[in-house]
Structure formats: C-alpha cells, structure tokens
Curated annotation (Swiss-Prot):
Reaction(s) catalysed (UniProt annotation): (S)-dihydroorotate + H2O = N-carbamoyl-L-aspartate + H(+)
Protein's name according to its UniProt entry: Dihydroorotase
GO cellular component, one term: cytoplasm
Biological role: Catalyzes the reversible cyclization of carbamoyl aspartate to dihydroorotate.
Gene responsible for this protein: pyrC
C-alpha cells in the first residue's frame, strides 16, 4: 500500500522536525517528505489536516497474557488494543504461563504477532530461568530467537550477585535488562501505598522506600559493572531523585513511568476500588509532581503503559486479594497528551517519550520518519473527545480506573510498514 499523507503537522524529534509537511510512503518505507508533494498514480491520499503525524508509538511494557492466560488477553486482542491506542510496536513481558524463558516460546510469541497482522510484537525474555531468581536464563538463545530485552517483570531479582552477573552478561550480549525494582521484605503483605489513605482504609501499606532501595541497588550495580539498565514503572519521588543523580554521574540508566503514576494518587483507592490497585501502587501528590518533573527534565525517558489486563472475576473481589494492574493501551495517549496541554511536555518531547526513546532503548530501528525508514506512523488528533466505554474497548479486559470518563485526544490512524491497520 502506497500513501501520501497530506496537511499534517509532522513531529519527528529524531530529525528535529515540527512543521506542516506531506509524507510519501512507498513499499512500506518513508520515501519522501516535503511541502506540496504530488501523489503518484495509485497512491492513496490521507488527509491529516488538524492532526499530528508522528513516528509510530512504541510501548515497551505490556502484558499480553499469551501463552496460558488467554482468558485475560491474547496476542491478537492485545494487538487490536495497541493499534487503537496508536501503538505500532509493543514489547510483551514474559510472565505468562509458562514464562518466556526459552527460544521456542519467544518464537511462538513472534509468530502469533505476525499472525495477528496488526502491530509489531516483540517478546521480552526472562532474566532468570523460570523467572525464579535462582540462575540466569539463556540470554544468548533468547536474543537469537528475537527477544529485545530480558526481565523478570512482576517480581524483583532478590539476589544481588545474580543481578550483577545478569548485567555483565547482558552487556556482553548487548541485550537490555529491565528491572522490576522492589524490596520484598519491605513490601510484605502491603496492598497499596503506605500513608494516610492506607491507614484510613485499614489496608496494609507498601512504603515508598521499598521501591527506592531496590532502584538504588540496581543503579549501583549498573555503575559498578558499567552496564546499561532500564528501570520499569517508576512511581516515587525518591526513585526519580536517585535516577536523576545517577544520570548526572554518567551511569547508563534509563527508566519509564506509566500514565497512572503522573495522573492518579492513592486517593483513587477510596471505596476500595480494585481498578486502582497495581504494583507499584499509586502514590501521593508529591510523587505525582516528581514524576511529572522527571518527565519534563528528561530524567524519565519513556512513557509505557504496563498494560495489565485481568478478568472481571479477579477484580470483583475484596481489595486484599484482587489482582494488581490495569489496562492502558487505549488510554495512554490521551492521558499523556494532557501533559502537553498542561505545559509539562512539548509535543516533541511527548513523541520522544512514547516513540523515539523506547525504540532506541530496545534497538528496534523504529521511532523515526527519516527517508528510508520503516513507515510506522501514528496520526493523532490531539483534541478529539471520546468516552471510555467497556463495549468499545478492543482489549478483552475492562479493568481501568477511567471507565466512563471523557478523554481528549486519540489516534485517528495507525500505520504499520505502510499499511493502515487502524482508522478511527
């Protein structure tokens, strides 16, 4: 499919672009960019007036639940949710059933992604065998099979010596390590952020320092081994401070946060709302402010969703036993666009956080509209109003704290390798 995208505001931080331009796509690649381009014969014209034309959004942290947990989500339904949210590439975490700790399962995920035929689906392999934290997984085989990173996401690597060796081996193999950072001895039986609200609700709390201590350890290990490390789902002011200081020292650390951490506080748990239960938990107002400041100054490199679908039966229970996590692929873009409207980020910075940076960290060769690049493109209407409604979500699951709320901004077209896979 060949396309001429006209009249759009092209924003591409990789080239320092933010201006009204036309974009010609031929044979799945960006062929030309300029003003007043003429459509060759047989080219479909896409009118992008009023829209931002950006490199396809990349979500480096999703849970697609396949294999083994398809009652929550599967690769096809997750891919549908991704393209509806404007994502052209997603990286799926390995905490499936069985976990993705061998090349056969990694290849299965890639094959199922291609079968779905919507977005690019990249597997993240386990950091340790069986995700048990006892010995390292076969990183070389996982990379050879197509894994773009390794992680035991969902649980931390408790053994510091094992984490040190993981960082050293991964550095040699040039595969990113994604750290789920929490000190389980401090987490204990906590189910929400420790503070005034947890006390008022009579729920056991998780102190912020549980995250801070674990991140400090992993940052120090990365510094000691001169290895890169990526910290997942940063949620505390202390974590932002630790990572900011580490970057100033030249430590090779990158990190991500998710929209719920710069949008909601633990007040959302009031009423024992299980759709506000996640790990790490929602924090307090000063943490939200710190996350927003970290996004603004570049301490936080990436906005990811941590899309975590769960069946209603796993959420419609007492708060203490409810599953952690919320869906995010279809709500991430409007929640993040609010940062632009509020002056926290420029539109170019937002595209960096949601496309360029995650692509660079994972080595995807995406996140750019440069001539000759793969034509993964998202068209965004930043002012389009819409309401989050269960029957209109593409995901199998509906566990979101924003159900029934009005959003502003959406992807109106998602293009993968020059093919329009979604239109709003």
């Amino acid at each position: 499919m060949n396309l001429l995208i006209q009249n759009g505001r092209v924003i591409d931080p990789s080239q320092g672009l933010d201006e009204e331009l036309d974009l010609l796509v031929e044979n799945g690649l960006v062929r030309e960019m300029g003003r007043g381009l003429t459509a060759p014969a047989g080219v479909e014209i896409v009118d992008a007036a009023g829209c931002c034309v950006v490199p396809g959004l990349v979500d480096m942290h999703v849970h697609l639940r396949e294999p083994g947990l398809e009652y929550k989500e599967d690769i096809e339904s997750g891919s549908r949710a991704a393209v509806a949210g404007g994502f052209t590439s997603i990286a799926c975490m390995p905490n499936t059933k069985p976990v993705i700790d061998n090349k056969a399962l990694a290849r299965y995920v890639i094959a199922r992604g291609r079968e779905a035929g919507l977005c690019n689906v990249f597997p993240v392999g386990c950091l340790t065998a069986g995700s048990k934290g006892e010995r390292l997984a076969e990183m070389g085989e996982l990379k050879e099979a197509g894994c773009v990173a390794v992680s035991d996401d969902g649980r931390p690597v408790v053994n510091a010596e094992l984490m040190r060796r993981a960082l050293e081996y991964a550095r040699g193999m040039q595969i990113p390590v994604i750290s789920h950072a929490e000190d389980l001895s401090l987490v204990g039986e906590g189910v929400m952020n420790e503070g005034f609200t947890s006390t008022e609700l009579g729920l056991k709390g998780i102190p912020r320092v549980a995250e801070d201590i674990a991140i400090a350890r992993d940052v120090m290990l990365a510094e000691y081994t001169n290895s890169p490390i990526h910290i997942a789902h940063v949620s505390t002011s202390g974590a932002v401070r630790i990572i900011r200081n580490a970057k100033l020292r030249g430590v090779r650390v990158t990190c991500e946060t998710a929209p719920h951490y710069f949008t909601l506080t633990d007040d959302a748990v009031r009423g024992y709302n299980t759709n506000a239960k996640m790990n790490p938990p929602l924090r307090e107002a000063d943490d939200v402010a710190a996350i927003r400041a970290g996004l603004s100054d570049g301490t936080i490199d990436v906005i990811a969703t941590d899309h975590a679908p769960h069946h209603l039966d796993e959420k419609d229970v007492e708060f203490n036993v409810a599953a952690n996590g919320i869906i995010g692929l279809e709500t991430s873009l409007p929640l993040s666009l609010a940062l632009v409207e509020q002056g926290v980020l420029t539109m170019s910075q937002l595209v960096e956080r949601m496309s360029c940076c995650p692509s660079l960290i994972l080595g995807l060769e995406r996140g750019t509209l440069a001539k000759g690049a793969v034509a993964d493109i998202t068209l965004i209407d930043p002012t389009l109003p819409w309401v989050v409604e269960a029957d209109k979500l593409a995901s199998k699951s509906t566990n979101t704290p924003w159900m029934g709320q009005e959003m502003k901004g959406a992807a109106v077209a998602t293009i993968v390798a020059g093919r329009v896979v979604y239109r709003r």
